[in-house]
């Protein structure tokens, strides 16, 4: 919403699926001719694109845009991808507004970059709760299951597919 209030803008996301999800929402609002999607796997760049939804790694750094946002900026601390997030933190700016979204764990570092910084805390839009250990057969639709290894993710997904008929997998290191 904030990006669309400007004449042009770009947001970098940590996950390509998130960039795609937001792209789909934005094109429903304003159409496909002004919105670009740039990830490692997809490049949809209309000639007259004014808005760019990208993975952080795929953000074009040569664009002159009113708004620039980077989601999950605390990923600067990640040992694998942190250098990209840090580069965006230090080098990419919107002409009118730059917004870094994410955890307050990086607030102290960001506050040293510029005196004219405003920090805004927003409540989570959806509620995330721990429901304890449950049998797969008793989970509700649209339940998120968190696992901590790729092997465990695929094993749980296969079990859900067999018992419930389907599962979606999203993996990342946030």
What is the predicted function of each stretch?
Residues 8, 48-51, 64-67, 73, ...:
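Loop/turn-to-beta-strand initiation segments
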Residues 4-13, 30-34:
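Post-Walker A helix-loop "phosphate-sensing" segment adjacent to the P-loop in P-loop NTPases
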